[in-house]
Amino acid sequence: HQSVIGLEAKAALDKYGLKPDIIIGCAGGGSNLGGLIAPFMGEKLRGEADYRFIAVEPASCPSFTRGKFAYDFCDTGMVCPMAKMYTLGNGFMPSPIHAGGLRYHGMSSTLSQLYHDGLMEARAVPQSSVFEAAEEFARVEGILPAPDSRHAIRAAIDEAIRCRETGEGKTILFGLTGTGYFDLKAYEQYNNGQMVDSVLTDEDLEKGFASIPNVNL
């Protein structure tokens, strides 16, 4: 069911004879991003097309960009089966950020393997930069984006600016998965200069890594 959005996006682009060069989605646990890229990734794996996939995660919970590829519990209670994934450790406690859906300690096993195999990229972005992009998007498009989606918008804007600087023309597809009308307090904090960016130290990460079980396979 998660790939429905990807199938719909592909069908809409096919209708107008378009193929995306870059496909961007926010990444917390992976369902959002995985659903969007699944149909396109299939084409890439079959050698039918060459897409560039970018996963965007919060800098305060950087499972892809700073996590370890290891077997770990999927839950903090260590009850569920373990899975091999990029993880910060089941005991990792992320800082409170407005994108609550992106605060999971691990990442989808499927996406983790794709990233590990070099089939997709990942980047981590700070909260204030995400809100800056969200406000720009709202003023231009008239849509106030959801907290998670703002991360994809940040990367999409950055890629568009890069195209403008290099003179390249690229089709960029990103996932906008909801609106942020229940998060107006966060926008108020951002505009009042009260937004805080959480920067993880290596020591913070090591505390989380200590909870990863030692599995020799």
Task: Please state what every model-predicted region is.
Residues 38-41, 136, 154-161:
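Short glycine/serine- and small hydrophobic-enriched flexible loop segments
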